[in-house]
């Protein structure tokens, strides 16, 4: 193969393998609208996966009486992400700046990079997706990188990275098949769904503020 053709193929392969193109002299600046579109696609995918998996798990394993007692008990329904200061209603959310909402979203994403491993068997056995833990982890990492890129663009025009948030969820015994293990998995799925919903909502608000014509969908 000619040297020129080989170089072209390598360049094309590199571009396809990078979901978030690094901004520098080698590449033109990626439009902000495209960066938001990429982030929103991943956020929506994660939220939909979390919602469907939670619903499927609930219908298959959690009796109604257990569901109600779980949701009404602050100790079992409290998510670790509650320790991350987040707006609790629409008014508070609108008062946050774009960078604040992106930072909150980044912390929420990073808080799941380790705990999501405890749900590997749940994702693998899901009839809705049958996805693997690594697929979910890759989506989280891609979205983490995308949010960091957006923060850099909105702040000073450059990409940025941040400290990974250290998870402190209690260890979940996914190897056990007793009711306690089921409720622990149910609790994790409940929190995962809740946090992915927040992330998609916050990103949608920032996109609406930042990209003309992106509101209302």
Swiss-Prot record:
Keyword Metal-binding listed? The answer is yes
Which UniProt keywords are listed? Disulfide bond, Hormone, Metal-binding, Phosphoprotein, Secreted, Signal, Zinc
UniProt xrefs under Gene3D superfamilies: 1.20.1250.10
The secretion signal range is 1-26
Q: Spell out the InterPro entries in the cross-references.
A: 4_helix_cytokine-like_core (IPR009079), Somatotropin (IPR034975), Somatotropin/Prolactin (IPR001400), Somatotropin_CS (IPR018116)
Q: Where in the cell is it found?
A: Secreted
Say yes or no: keyword Disulfide bond present. Answer: yes
Q: Which GO terms describe its cellular component?
A: extracellular space
- Disulfide bonds, paired cysteine numbers: 79-191, 208-215
Detail which positions bind Zn(2+).
Answer: 44, 200
Q: Name one GO molecular function term.
A: growth factor activity
GO annotations under biological process?
animal organ development; growth hormone receptor signaling pathway; positive regulation of receptor signaling pathway via JAK-STAT; response to nutrient levels
Q: Where does the record place the modification Phosphoserine? A: 132
What protein family is recorded?
A: Belongs to the somatotropin/prolactin family.
> What is the annotated role of this protein in its UniProt record?
Plays an important role in growth control. Its major role in stimulating body growth is to stimulate the liver and other tissues to secrete IGF1. It stimulates both the differentiation and proliferation of myoblasts. It also stimulates amino acid uptake and protein synthesis in muscle and other tissues.
The record ties this protein, via PANTHER family, to: SOMATOTROPIN, SOMATOTROPIN,PROLACTIN
This protein is called: Somatotropin
